[in-house]
């Protein structure tokens, strides 16, 4: 990411994707301001958006045909507070609008069965994310960060709307030549309503683990 800091006011302008987002495979871009508040921590506010649209099936329930893909775009705002009141607590809140170019979920099924399920399966709408974490720093430039994660999808289709609650544990180690970051996540997802095509909710227990290795100054470039 690109950053510029005004030394007198300790105000920073930033643009790009933060490394803590990238290691979670969240490539949302940010344009915003970050301000040091003395011993009260660092607050930041930013616009969030995706430069490269994500591709999904326009109708994931279509069968017997070649499915077509569609782009998903999102934009919104994020507020973050690092080192809350001088502590090792970190928090952020993100809200964004999700817009699909061609949302056709359930349309083929409706045409074949004479139903009216498409509105319940609409994936356009709003997403809200909250995270509260605590950082432990210990010997050898190592970091351990447990976090509570909450996500709510208030989508136009009630059968696609859901709430996520989870726990995440991040471990990081930084060396002079390389760095390593790993994440362990477990959570639950509960949908507001049953999927009308399958007659049941797609509630799920979630588990994820990932690791990212960084090599500094590759080919001598800083």
Task: Give residue spans per PLM region.
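Outer-membrane beta-barrel initiation region
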Residues: 1-12
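Transmembrane beta-strands of outer-membrane beta-barrel pores
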Residues: 6-8, 17-21, 47-53, 85, ...
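Solenoidal tandem-repeat scaffolds enriched in leucines and small polar residues
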Residues: 75-138
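Residues that define the transmembrane beta-barrel architecture of outer-membrane proteins
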Residues: 25-29, 71-77, 124-130, 159-165, ...
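Outer-membrane beta-barrel translocator/channel fold
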Residues: 46-99, 183-208, 222
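Residues on the lipid-exposed face of transmembrane beta-strands in outer-membrane beta-barrel proteins
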Residues: 2-4, 31-35, 77-83, 130-136, ...
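Transmembrane beta-strands of outer-membrane beta-barrel proteins
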Residues: 11-15, 41-45, 87-93, 142-148, ...
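Outer-membrane beta-barrel translocator domains and adjoining extracellular loop/strand segments
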Residues: 24-31, 54-64, 96, 101-120, ...
